[in-house]
A protein has these predicted regions:
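ATP-binding N-terminal substructure of ATP-dependent carboxylate-amine bond-forming enzymes
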Residues: 1-143
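Rossmann-like NAD(P)H-binding beta-loop-alpha module
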Residues: 146-151
Length: 151
């Protein structure tokens, strides 16, 4: 189901709309430590089971969610307010995720670091593309730990 096929209630809420399920005292954090209050939209690259758990918890805390995953039956995409069905490196899909989201994260470390870098130019992104790039390369990861003094 594309966003255009979802019911109107699944669209990004208008300014000042009530967050789903009332929210919580614990908030997501955007750049410079500014909190993202319930009612904000959290974007996720990846729509697997970890993404689904993230989406459920975010919604329980009062956040809206947007998932980018090419699989039309991705577990997170099925429960998210928005499901952008495209690949991680699709420029239009990344732009749509940035448009819908107030901040973006990734479900797991195997998304292209370049996609996170693209999003980071538009929205707060965590983890950083550079951190994901290190996590994707075991030799680089070991060198990074040595440089940080980790035995």
């Amino acid at each position: 189901m594309n966003d255009s096929d979802k019911p109107l209630s699944a669209a990004r809420p208008p300014e000042g709309a009530q967050a789903p399920l009332g929210g919580s005292a614990t908030h997501a954090v955007a750049s410079a430590g500014a909190p993202l209050l319930p009612g904000s939209t959290l974007g996720v690259l990846g729509g697997g089971q970890l993404g689904r758990m993230f989406v459920h918890q975010a919604q329980a805390m009062g956040y809206f969610t947007a998932v980018l995953d090419a699989d039309p039956t991705s577990p997170a995409g099925l429960v998210s307010h928005h499901h952008i069905q495209t690949g991680y490196e699709d420029a239009a899909g990344l732009a749509e995720l940035a448009r819908l989201s107030d901040a973006v994260t990734t479900e797991f470390e195997n998304v292209p670091a370049a996609a996170l870098a693209t999003l980071a130019a538009l929205r707060p992104v965590s983890p950083a593309a550079s951190a994901v790039a290190v996590a994707q390369d075991r030799a680089q990861e070991k060198a990074h730990f040595v440089a940080c003094g980790v035995p």
